[in-house]
Amino acid sequence: MSASYLPSILVPLVGLVFPAITMVSLFLYIEQDEIV
């Protein structure tokens, strides 16, 4: 199966993308809170 290499790509991707989304959503939440 060609899916054996999938975790080696998926783990760093999730490890980088998930914190990035969390930081951006937190930043937008703080910015909206300051504007209001």
Swiss-Prot record:
Compartments it resides in: Plastid, Chloroplast thylakoid membrane
GO CC entries: chloroplast thylakoid membrane; photosystem I
Keyword Signal: no
UniProt keyword Transmembrane present: yes
TM region positions: 9-29
Membrane topology: Single-pass membrane protein
Protein name according to UniProt: Photosystem I reaction center subunit VIII
